[in-house]
């Protein structure tokens, strides 16, 4: 059958097509949409750190008064970590090699942080913690860090203990990014990314908090799901016998196959890649996931963990993975440039523009 359209009809059709394409481009440029992003993941996966990065990147960072609000948390994190080290020494029946540290450990264990927000770390205690951290026995303890709970930022705080111990100590943004306090309930952060008005909801990661997530589930544009790659050899804070990575897999499976998220894209942050790189040569992934056969190769190990997560996606949602280091502002800035494109595309589809 011949072509029934005249040359003038064809030109008109082509012009109309070009006009439609231009209109779509114009609509996209003018497009302004509120996007609801749900930030999910198990406890200590880095969700709250991502929220802090959004404040630094998109909300002009922290004022001095806001930084001071984190001073007590930083001091508590430091002291808790030092006490965890002392308890680990006793658990493994080890003793410090430096004589002064054999006396320091009792003082560290008995030290209590003043609950007053204006409290500072005692100078003498700061020196004791610094001395313990420099003790030759410490590497032997750290080799067994998967056998006791020690927060990821412990080494960072120990390295900065003398600065933190100053009477006029004001946390900097790096301190704030590493400060850890349990997230309870639901917090909302609002910021703009280009033509997108983002409403980012951070929900508590601990088990007791998960029943509250239901309130956030309606009309979600995207989910950002955080997984700490470094947790493959760790146990849950809530239940010492449960592997953290296995728990994250169960949680991810329940999220991606939920009836609430049938049309939602999932942005998967494989977080704490820096700690993962340090840990893989020392703690074989195959010890915890026997079917893994890639050895200490960081890329193979990360790909295997990604594969484990994507295998749970029976609902066949679109999953966009990113390797992240939530404490590194430049890394998160780059990652969110890519995330913005994903969210924008989904928002345009939801609005019928694409």
From Swiss-Prot:
A lipid is attached at residue 4 (S-palmitoyl cysteine). GO terms for molecular function: G protein-coupled receptor binding; G-protein beta/gamma-subunit complex binding; GTP binding; GTPase activity; metal ion binding. Pfam families: G-alpha (PF00503). GO terms for cellular component: cytoplasm; heterotrimeric G-protein complex. Residues 36-49 are annotated as: G1 motif. Residues 33-354 form the G-alpha domain. GTP binds at residues 41-48, 177-183, 202-206, 271-274, 326. Residues 267-274 are annotated as: G4 motif. A lipid is attached at residue 2 (N-myristoyl glycine). InterPro entries: Fungi_Gprotein_alpha, Gprotein_alpha_su, GproteinA_insert, P-loop_NTPase. Gene3D superfamilies: GI Alpha 1, domain 2-like, P-loop containing nucleotide triphosphate hydrolases. Belongs to the G-alpha family. G proteins are composed of 3 units; alpha, beta and gamma. The alpha chain contains the guanine nucleotide binding site. This is Guanine nucleotide-binding protein alpha-3 subunit. It comes from Mycosarcoma maydis (Corn smut fungus).
